Amino acid sequence: MIFTVTLNTAIDHIIEVEGTLTRKANNKTKNVIYDIGGKAIHVSVALSYMNIPNKATGIVGGKMGQLMVELAEKKGVDCHFFEQENCETRESIILLDQSGQGSYMITQRGFVLSRSSIQKIRDFLFDNVQKDDIVVFSGTPPQGFDIKDYKDLLMVVKEKGARLIADTTKEYLQTALTCHPTLVKPNEFEFQEFIQRELHTIDDYVNALKEMSDLAEMWVVSLGKKGSIAK
């Protein structure tokens, strides 16, 4: 079984306006869409689309949290999310116009997870994950999430004999690597930040990844339009 863990759930609120978005003007909407946000849940959506069994877990709150679960279930995701009372799943507001110059993105921080919520995730992983399962932690945890709690969740997975995949950044990436994950997937900027030097060519990345081979079984570094490099 594949499990995905979304610690900072989100709803993408996509607003498309007519013409070009203009300051100090009445920009009329052409279309408004609500969609699932959060990296890990997107993994579950992709797996479900390919009819690959998986379970998605995490913490949601309020009407936006309920909407996120409903949208995920409509896409075939087997959801096992827990609700934190008096909190609201964050919105990522995406503004699109017809200029062809890209979008504007305004992202809320998300709510602080309670001790009870963190324990629910831990208990779910402990009770359900089995040897050789795959558990995906993708995205950055919400504000105030203690690095010790993050490592504790990862270690539950490792102690169960499951395969750990981490797609995160900064201190959370560093912590994931102390658990010797099966795979990590930073982007080019996150990877350069981690190794504390700039990389310019494919050979630069290949040589840097050779230095990191003891930290994870597999590395995939996404390079934007240039594709990805894996080791």
Can you name each region flagged by the protein language model?
Residues M1-T57, G65-L67:
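Glycine-rich phosphate/adenosyl-contacting loop at the front of the ribokinase-like
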Residues V5-T9, I59-G62, Q84, Q98, ...:
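Cofactor-binding loop segments of dinucleotide-utilizing enzymes, especially the Rossmann-like FAD-
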Residues T9-I11, V60-K63, E190, K225-K226:
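Glycine-rich beta-alpha junction loops
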Residues Y49-D133:
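Conserved N-terminal subdomain of the carbohydrate kinase-like
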Residues M105-T107, D132-T140, D167, K185-E190:
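Short beta-strands and strand-loop turn motifs
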Residues K148-K231:
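Conserved phosphate/ATP/ADP-binding segment of small-molecule kinases
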